[in-house]
Amino acid sequence: MSLTQSAKLHIIHQSIGKITTRLYDTSPFHGDSHCKQRRVKDNCIQFNMNISNVLKCYSEIESFSINQRIRRSISLFLSILRSFYSMRMRLLDLFITSSIPVAKILLITGIGFYLALDQVNILNHDARKQLNNIVFYVFSPSLVASSLSETITYESMVKMWFMPLNVLLTFIIGSFLGWIVIKITKPPSHLRGIIVGCCAAGNLGNMPLIIIPAICNEKGSPFGDPESCEKFGLGYIALSMAIGAIYIWTYVYNLMRMLANPAGETAINSTSSTMPLISPKVEVAEQVGTWGKVKQRVCSVAEKINLRTIFAPSTIAALIALAVGLNPLLRKLLVGNTAPLRVIEDSVSLLGDGAIPVLTLIVGGNLLNGLRGSGINKSVIMGVVVVRYLLLPILGVFIVRGAHYLGLVTSEPLYQFVLLLQYVVPPAMNLGTITQLFGSGESECSVILFWSYALASVSLTVWPTFFMWLVA
């Protein structure tokens, strides 16, 4: 039995009301890739049924005398609603989702700041130095080893092959932008290494480890089931953290050391220039050809690079974890609930759990020096902030989306989100460890870290919101 025209109009009226209500009351995702949770899937199905009813009834009442403008307005209204529902996520939900992990970091940092006050004097300079050594030699290597060994396999290595290249690009591009900041601001020589380090090395460890689980477990997350999201997300972060640790202690550490000690290089060059007046052996060296000069240059660079810093504890832990994860026999012995030697892996994992809170407390204590000031130029701080929170994220969007367009990156939203997140994190906390190992620049580094992490609450809310919309 066919419906009357008035009945059809009544169905249209009810359906439009239901659609409008669901725009505010339901999670705005559609399609198989986003409707993974039962509640969201039901809402998507009901929404599509409402749309179908409206369009079907609307197409059958052509003979009904409705003004053409009204019909076009209704059609345009329905198109806008459907487009909004299918292509846009609720920005308020995403804003809240991405701001929660930042609030956690700031809260723990505030506790570290309080413990470092002179009135409390629990986390004083000596205490931070000792804790820093414990993190460097125990906590951080344990965290890298446990996270990487649990998640790394041949299959995951093939799937995530672009991630090491992506992290390397963040370091290289950041170094280049840091060099531009140095040329513009003209800071003292002892600050050059700190500036380049802050622009190059991002916090690929505890920041993403807090951000990803928080986003996965929040209502409105575009990454599907919370358990699967957290499992795969932590796997991506573990590899990112391990690669970042290797780059920091091989590339950034030696780069900061060489940039911070130009006087030592001058002394070496000066000594070599006076050697012909003292040693007759140089006369033979002057006759050496191009190959000899290249060999001398390689030896000179090798002398400047300290192998002990390249093979830092975190680097060694990453190499061991790779060997365990990629070797099926070792993996069966050490990793998993049924592994005979799982007590070793559990103990390492337990030690690694202390890395994030202790590192965050140390940063909070170091920020106290930043508040007291060190006479650092404001343009230097502004340059680092612009590089880390504006230029790098913009370039990261083009790199990751370009790689996806070329087929170098899979279409998985969570994987792309982690790749994008690597461009927007604040400077690495290990930079504070490096400056303390150098014994200089701690105050200036604390100032930069203070303002970087203070503004991270804005950057790590705005950019992840945009990234989630971009990849969803």
From Swiss-Prot:
Range of residues in the leader sequence: none
Tissue-level expression: Expressed in flowers.
Topology Lumenal: residue spans: 1-93, 155-161, 215-231, 331-347, 401-413, 468-472
GO biological process: auxin-activated signaling pathway; endoplasmic reticulum to cytosol auxin transport
InterPro entries: Mem_transp_PIN-like, PILS1/3/4/5/7
TM region(s), chain numbering: 94-114, 134-154, 162-182, 194-214, 232-252, 310-330, 348-368, 380-400, 414-434, 447-467
Assigned keywords, A-Z: Auxin signaling pathway, Endoplasmic reticulum, Membrane, Transmembrane, Transmembrane helix, Transport
Source organism, top-level taxon: Eukaryota
Segments in the Cytoplasmic topological domain: 115-133, 183-193, 253-309, 369-379, 435-446
Pfam name, any one: Mem_trans
Membrane topology: Multi-pass membrane protein
Any one annotated GO CC term: endoplasmic reticulum membrane
Subcellular location(s) of the protein: Endoplasmic reticulum membrane
Biological function: Involved in cellular auxin homeostasis by regulating auxin metabolism. Regulates intracellular auxin accumulation at the endoplasmic reticulum and thus auxin availability for nuclear auxin signaling.
UniProt similarity note: Belongs to the auxin efflux carrier (TC 2.A.69.2) family.
Protein name: Protein PIN-LIKES 1
Species name: Arabidopsis thaliana (Mouse-ear cress)
Highest classification ranks of the organism: Eukaryota, Viridiplantae, Streptophyta, Embryophyta, Tracheophyta
